[in-house]
Swiss-Prot record:
Its cofactor is a divalent metal cation. One of its GO terms (cellular component) is Slx1-Slx4 complex. This is Structure-specific endonuclease subunit slx1. Catalytic subunit of the slx1-slx4 structure-specific endonuclease that resolves DNA secondary structures generated during DNA repair and recombination. Has endonuclease activity towards branched DNA substrates, introducing single-strand cuts in duplex DNA close to junctions with ss-DNA. Keywords: DNA damage, DNA recombination, DNA repair, Endonuclease, Hydrolase, Metal-binding, Nuclease, Nucleus, Zinc, Zinc-finger. Belongs to the SLX1 family. It holds the Pfam family GIY-YIG. The lineage of its organism: Eukaryota, Fungi, Dikarya, Ascomycota, Pezizomycotina. Its main location: nucleus. Residues 120-129 have a biased composition (Basic residues).
């Protein structure tokens, strides 16, 4: 019997998204997938490097362009569920029609005519009708309104100006509005000023500049480590109780000048109570009890997950800090900021911008995560609980087996 490998928990990914591709040769050809690295995934789909999908491999359709991404997923599983949801709905409808609908059974019997010697005639399989851009907009709209995804801090980032205008025109015709305001970011070729262009301060400038590494919150992680390294007087700003960082999950305010620390449960309860949403289980944002700034809950959880799960990297950072502290104790005239700068220089080596090392974790985990981002809908969820050995990268399609490229 093979040994069962147990995968240790990893930090929450800084960036994970579902994306929509369009062929620049034939605009009716669209493709959906999910990835933690959109720039690398686009290069794979265009055949520059290995690892593309079968349905984007046709040279007559290349190159592909990335039209939009839905970002803000806190796990690979959540992104895959969002990616595969439309295909799963179609599968359930087909199974229901085959098993429980008498009319469908009668129609099947009528269509099965007999030939000579009573041999039944095989019915030809109808090709799936092309899924238009409006159909993808409808799927996106339905998923964002669903109970499961409407409470997540998801954002829509448009890289194509004409696609944003198409979405805007389509959404204006829809009677049902989204349950909560979804942040829309205009990026790439989209204009920077628009009626719904909220969050343009977070523009990447293009898919190739997507911020997908923990280097984006380096200062935040460093500040939290400094605050909690000497927990003699670390208290919760909600319950005023003593905090033991090594034994309790502790949140730190992401504001640079704020030193607020709280118990995880205390702060989450405070945020949920302030939101006054009866069905909310996980907060989206809240007001810091110390500096009173609005802070994003997912950002705080990413920092906390790194601090509590990336043990090896955390120990290396602390060792550097303590070496600097020892040197500082024998050198006079040094200010605290110089110590912070010295540690920052060392941290830059650990927070490199290389996409292969963006999580500061082992390479096998990151490569496996990226290579499995476009697996088939019927197989993807079954393989999540199994630890796969390192094999040659094989990328399959993001949609179901009977789907066809448009």
């Amino acid at each position: 019997m093979e040994d069962i490998q147990i995968e240790h928990p990893r930090p929450i990914p800084i960036f994970y998204c579902c994306y929509l591709l369009r062929s620049t040769v034939r605009h009716a050809s669209l493709y959906i997938g999910s990835t933690p690295n959109p720039a690398r995934r686009l290069v794979q789909h265009n055949g520059v490097v290995k690892g593309g999908a079968r349905r984007t491999a046709a040279e007559k359709l290349r190159p592909w362009e990335m039209l939009l991404v839905v970002e803000g997923f806190t796990s690979r599983l959540a992104a895959l569920q969002f990616d595969s949801a439309p295909a799963e709905v179609k599968h359930r409808r087909k199974r229901k029609a085959k098993s429980g609908d008498p009319e469908s059974l009668d129609s099947n019997c009528d269509s099965a005519k007999t030939k000579d010697k009573g041999t039944p005639k095989k019915s030809k399989r109808r090709p799936r009708p092309p899924r238009s851009l409006d159909t993808h907009f409808s799927d996106l709209h339905r998923l964002l309104r669903s109970t499961y995804f409407s409470h997540r801090p998801l954002k829509i980032r448009f890289f194509s100006g004409d696609i944003y205008q198409s979405w805007k025109a389509w959404y204006d015709r829809v009677d049902v509005r989204l349950r909560s305001p979804v942040k829309v970011i205009l990026d790439g070729s989209c204009p920077e000023i628009g009626a719904h262009a909220s969050g343009n301060d977070t523009r990447f400038g293009g898919v190739e500049n997507a911020k997908i590494t923990y280097a984006t919150i380096q200062d935040y992680i460093e500040k939290a480590i400094f605050l909690l390294d000497d927990p003699k007087d670390v208290r919760c700003h909600v319950c005023q109780g003593q905090i033991v960082p090594k034994e309790e999950l502790t949140t730190v305010c992401p504001q640079a000048e704020c030193h607020c620390t709280c118990h995880l449960l205390c702060l989450s309860r405070k945020f949920i109570d302030a939101a006054e949403e009866p069905n909310q289980i996980v907060p989206r944002h809240g007001i810091c009890p110390a500096c009173e700034a609005t802070v994003e809950w997912p950002l705080m959880m990413k920092e906390l997950s790194f601090r509590s799960r990336a043990k090896q990297e955390l120990l290396e950072i602390l060792k550097r800090k303590r070496r600097v502290d020892r040197k500082q104790s024998v050198v006079t005239g040094k200010v605290e900021s110089s110590s912070r700068r010295s540690v920052s220089v060392d941290l830059d080596d650990r927070f490199g911008q290389d996409a292969e090392d963006e999580f500061l974790l082992d390479e096998d985990w990151w490569d496996g995560l990226a290579s499995e981002s476009d697996s088939d809908a019927d197989r993807r969820l079954k393989t999540l609980s199994k630890a796969a050995p390192k094999l040659e990268t094989v990328i399959e399609d993001s949609e179901c087996d009977d789907a066809e490229i448009l």
